[in-house]
Amino acid sequence: MSRDLTNHLLFEISTEVCNKVGGIYSVLKTKAPITVKEYGTKRYHCIGLLNRDKYEVEIEELPLDYDILHNKCSKDDDDYPIKEAILKMRDRGVGIVYCKWLIEGSPKSILFDLDSVRGKYLNDWKKDLWVSNGIPSPDSDFETNDAIILGYLVTWFLGEVIYSDQQKHALVAHCHEWLAGVCLPVIRHRKLGVVTIFTTHATLLGRY
């Protein structure tokens, strides 16, 4: 079965999804209404990390379990493989909040709880990033560690979506800044069928 390029699934990935830190939050907030209008709420999802200190004022959590998936959703729905992927990862111990971001357009969003997997997977993922891509990481750099965890969770999630989707849709992953971009070399190394986009902003990386 050939993948549907016209009705592709778009995932926008940033550490500022549902997490107001700097300018990227404003960029995402500004583009959300037109993106949701073009893609609808089933083909466009934002992905970020769960900031427990502030996420509750940014989102409305959406109920999702296997009963809802099997009894209230159709396998023909564009977002069925996305919901199934979330549930499969939850079964493996990954903390995930599935929600509606309370900004204009109300994009569906997926927030990963990095602490839910930090102790179990971080060292293995740091080793894999070095072995597979030659990218080193400091032992105790919290920011880099978070970027690695988020990157591997995004890669894992996209792999689950591809498996559940059975090649019905093309997938596009748009990553904002290096903090959300670790998934890019991992996706390429694993040869996942995902179109990737990287945008850098008014940061040190973007300017120089």
Placement of each model-derived feature along the sequence:
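Catalytic cores of nucleotide-sugar-dependent glycosyltransferases that transfer UDP/GDP/TDP-activated
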Residues: 1-208
